Amino acid sequence: MDGNEIAHAKKLVYDLYSGSLSPSAIAATEKELQKAQRSQQGWNIGLFMLQSKDVYEQFFGALTLQMKINTQLETLSDKDLVQLFVQLLQKLLWDDGLPALVERKVICTLASLTIKYELEKKEEASLKVIYCLFCNKLEFFNADMNAASVLNNLFPPASSRNAQLTASYINELLLELSFSIYTKENEDALFNNVFRPCSNIIVSVLVFIFTNYSLDLSKEKNVAALEEALNCMIAISSYLAKASVSVQSVLPAFTECMDLTVNCIALDEVSEKAMNCLADLLANYSNFITQPTIERLWTILTGPWGETHLQQELEDPDSGEENDYSFLNIVIGFAEAMLPQIIDHIQEEKSIRLLYILASLLSFPGYAIVEEKVSWRTLEFWTTLIEDFSMSKAATDPSKDEIFKQIAFSVVEKAWWKMLLPSPEQWNSWPSSSRDSFNSYRRDLGDLLESSYSIFGERLYAMYITTIENFFSDGTGSPQSLEVSFYCLCCILEYDTNDSDTLDAWLTRLFETSFAIKASAFQNPQLLKTCSQLLSSCSCFLQNHPQYLNISLPVLFDALHISETSIQMTVSRSIHTLCTTCASHLLTEIDGFMAVVEELTPKLVYVPSVLEKIYSSVGYVTQRIEDIELRISYLMRLLNCILAQLQPSLYPNLEIFENVLKSCLQSVAGVALSQSPIGESPIIDVEQSTQETTFWQQSCIAEFQAKLISFLTHSESMALQYSDVVGLICKIMIAGLNEVEPSPFSLPIVTTIQYFCDRFTEFPAAVLLTLGSAILTCPYGQTDIIDKVLIDMCSSIQNSVVIINEESFMNNIDITVELYHFFSIILQKHPSFLETMYPDFTQLILNRAINLLGKPERLLESAAGQFIISFITSEKSDLLNTHTDFVNAIRSPLIAKILLGFGGNASRSSLPLLSDILGKLKAQNFSATRACLTQSLEEEGFPSRNVSNEIKRRFLTDLLKARIKDKVKQFWILCKGLESTPYGNSSWTF
């Protein structure tokens, strides 16, 4: 042994734990220690330090040995391996004063050694280790023994400390099996070679500890042994769940351990550990716990012991006492496991007492944010219970139904209190994470109310609306209590979407209180936000009772003056909902509506989504105006209002102006979308439409569209970068093109075509190609799309640098996807155009489309594949020979690409598309396709070397049939070498 290396390692350990090193020096020292561990002297360093009297040296020695075991065990001889086992066992058995830190690390090292040894040497070591630790008989490690002989001679243990050491070792062994790096190596070998041989002995040890040491907890080692046994129970549960094996088939004796664990729950010294253990067991193995044990646990939880712990759970969280929610875990775990029994026996005292405990947990003090876990975790149980009960047979039993409703209604009442917002000052003091957490919890409480509505119905409306009426009549409540009643109503209105006389009557009572106006008087932002949500939820009611609109919308517009984005967004969504639902009732208010919008626009240009909602809202109202000239006059006012904001001098810098510009364009896009015609029949005959259609000849339409084009041109010229605005401009144009009948935003086809051609060459953007596709599919103006127009559009595309350069073509995925979509439409609408006017370009994009098949970019592959299908199937009776020549030219490379995909070069998701293309080729020319398939599959090793020529011959026969999906799947699996894997044997299809 090199004494210098040992001394150097000892100094490094001393320096590392001395607390005198800087962070950089600590990193350097750790690096030096790792180098020493990896060296040839690492084994000697570990063994030498393990015998030291210094705690940190002992710990480092065990750590070094564990590292060497995990990475370099093969460097030890069989004799050295046995000696290493003995030395680790000696450390545990002969050193009574071993510090807990060192003891745990030595046990971890021993567990790692056991697993590695049994995997590589295929010899049992865990049985011997358990026997030596339990019986304190080190000399028996070299003896021949099996599971039967160990069981016959194992009991009793030498001492409670030996029992504790054994349980600690079992726990670490199971943890290593579950989480160590070796689980990836061979999970089946770990289960069969390590766990299974000693599993019954493990259970026997645990049964002995639970049975004997729970009787006398005055001894510290007895308590320690019980705690380790409980840790083992959690570890076994975790490992069996991870290994996906049945307790009943693999470890039936584990049931006895679970039963005995219940006895520990009432033992103060190990109660919390036992509760956590049982919560874990109930989550995974509740069906294996015997009924007598379940009854015993039920009695404990609902008896004096449970009541005491419930009171502890409900203590003030600011009292300074730690609470790890062990009682909550066990109660929730037990209640979830017993859910069917609770429902079936809801009238029994034990069920009622358990449910009242769970209801009480919703009264946990404090706000339900991240730090408050009690109410949060209880909520999910109640939501599930209410839903399950409402669908059970018990709900049809009047006595059971009445008992359950009494308990559940108390939960609903507690939910109201739990939803209460804090004061504005406290709310603003919370970090955003806490506010988000609270809002998330409120949404979960809303789910509870929705579930409760299925059993309570009108009773919930009565409770919340009566509470609101009393609030306004008494005048003594807080804004928070009013807000939470609004919120609860929102929740159940989302659930109850059906109109009914009962609902109508209750909402009439609600609106008769003028709640919106009275709520706005508090000037409480959160109250106004929830009030706006409630108005939105009542949109269908307001559609049938428009008299309440004039006292609702003004409140919402006033709320937009609150300079808080989240509130503005909520309010704008509510305005949008009311305007889309009740537009026809708001025509008389249009002038006031417009005035408010004009006033708010300068303040809202900084919040694009809000401004868009407001503009599209007024757009929906104007769309209901039958007089086209009057309608256009309001649209002109909106456009002029937007134009007034586009003055750079109004803003501190150009960057802010650029954002305002985009906000304004987004708002105009919202107006454009709002102008969708609502009539069932178009005002023009789509089939007979001509350039002379009177719609565009109306002076008001022509004037508005001239103004719109001027606005778009002006916006382009003022943008710092065209790329920032092109998407919004195209969105405005597309909104007009997508209508069944033209709207004021439906620019003439020739205008949009000219815009496309002028812009695409210098700025090839995907959204421009989307515009091109919209032009081709527009239901009117198609007579304007003559060959010259198509030539102009295709020439703009052909001359684009992005299209010419193959690398750019492949890298700009969004452009390429839209390009193939555009050309697919041309093939459908104008079948012979591409081959006649652009034969070389057509061949180019076809070849590139073939190359894209099998690519991982799914959207790109799909677009290219659909283009190929459109090309093959397009009808070209006037150019049949030319089309046949084109298809024949691509047939061979296309089939080769398809076969490569079938042969494993494409992902599973590509197989349906490739199969579809092959089907179209067969339909177009079966004999030519068969010849290409035959020639390709005769090539040696093509498309994969994993399949024989005989398999390929059978596959060729299969491909020539009508139904090929199953055969393609089988061939793909064989080529990928997956036939023996679970994935290959699974039942997936396409």
UniProtKB/Swiss-Prot annotation:
Example GO biological process = protein import into nucleus
From which domain of life does this come?
A: Eukaryota
Q: What is its main location?
A: nucleus
SUPFAM superfamilies associated with the record: ARM repeat
A GO cellular component annotation in the UniProt record: nuclear envelope
Q: What is this protein called?
A: Importin beta-like protein kap111
Which key words tag this protein in UniProt?
Nucleus, Transport
Localization in the cell: Nucleus
Q: Tell me what organism the protein belongs to.
A: Schizosaccharomyces pombe (strain 972 / ATCC 24843)
Q: Which Gene3D superfamilies match?
A: Leucine-rich Repeat Variant (1.25.10.10)
Q: What Pfam families does its record include?
A: Importin_rep_3
What the protein does comes down to:
Functions as a component of the nuclear pore complex (NPC). NPC components, collectively referred to as nucleoporins (NUPs), can play the role of both NPC structural components and of docking or interaction partners for transiently associated nuclear transport factors. Active directional transport is assured by both, a Phe-Gly (FG) repeat affinity gradient for these transport factors across the NPC and a transport cofactor concentration gradient across the nuclear envelope.
Transmembrane regions = none
Task: Please give the family membership noted in the entry.
Answer: Belongs to the importin beta family.
The GO terms this record gives for MF are: GTP binding; nuclear import signal receptor activity
